[in-house]
Amino acid sequence: MRAVVQRISEGKVVVDDAVTGAIKKGLLVFLGVTKEDTMEDVQYMAEKIVNLRIFEDQEEKMNLSVKDVGGKILAVSQFTLLGDCRKGRRPSFTEAARPETADKLYEAFIEQCEKLDIKVEKGVFQAHMMVHLVNDGPVTMLIDSKKVF
């Protein structure tokens, strides 16, 4: 499971001119599910992201989590995070999970974050989405449950 996590001051997802999810201060999480992912990966990613200390404390040191600052998560499924661009010019998505599996694990990630007392808004799985955000910092982190990087 792979995520791009951005600290944002606000963000929203729009599908067919309707807002499907919107937050103020928090994290925008683009989540890609691999064909090898399990509930263990879901658990790892949810706990890592909810407790990731990338918000500044009073001394302007990154020392607070989204939970600590009372923020929310805006979760967006994005299979293109699994694109392999090492060969040729067209990405290969062979490592991405099948849609039915990816949807199940994406929803499980959201549920796990909510079990950790974080409010989660979301995009629409497999929809063409317009994602609007104001990146705070900017602060952007890459997280992989297999610890590839």
Curated annotation (Swiss-Prot):
Note the SUPFAM superfamilies from the entry: DTD-like
Write out the entry's keywords from A to Z. Answer: Cytoplasm, Hydrolase, RNA-binding, tRNA-binding
Per the record, the coiled-coil ranges are: none
Q: Which reaction does it catalyse?
A: glycyl-tRNA(Ala) + H2O = tRNA(Ala) + glycine + H(+); a D-aminoacyl-tRNA + H2O = a tRNA + a D-alpha-amino acid + H(+)
Q: Where in the cell does this protein reside? A: Cytoplasm
Keyword Metal-binding on entry: no
InterPro entries to which the protein is assigned, alphabetical: Daa-tRNA_deacyls_DTD, DTD-like_sf
This enzyme's EC code(s) = 3.1.1.96
- Would you tell me the Gene Ontology cellular component terms? cytoplasm
- Swiss-Prot/TrEMBL GO biological process terms: D-amino acid catabolic process
Molecular functions per Gene Ontology? D-tyrosyl-tRNA(Tyr) deacylase activity; Gly-tRNA(Ala) deacylase activity; Ser(Gly)-tRNA(Ala) hydrolase activity; tRNA binding
Where does motif Gly-cisPro motif, important for rejection of L-amino acids map? 137-138
- Its quaternary structure? Homodimer.
Q: Which PANTHER family match?
A: D-AMINOACYL-TRNA DEACYLASE 1, D-TYROSYL-TRNA TYR DEACYLASE
Which HAMAP family does UniProt cross-reference here? Deacylase_Dtd
* Role noted for this protein: An aminoacyl-tRNA editing enzyme that deacylates mischarged D-aminoacyl-tRNAs. Also deacylates mischarged glycyl-tRNA(Ala), protecting cells against glycine mischarging by AlaRS. Acts via tRNA-based rather than protein-based catalysis; rejects L-amino acids rather than detecting D-amino acids in the active site. By recycling D-aminoacyl-tRNA to D-amino acids and free tRNA molecules, this enzyme counteracts the toxicity associated with the formation of D-aminoacyl-tRNA entities in vivo and helps enforce protein L-homochirality.
Instruction: Read off the domain note.
Output: A Gly-cisPro motif from one monomer fits into the active site of the other monomer to allow specific chiral rejection of L-amino acids.
What is the designated name of this protein? Answer: D-aminoacyl-tRNA deacylase
- Source organism lineage? Bacteria, Bacillati, Bacillota, Clostridia, Peptostreptococcales
Originating gene = dtd
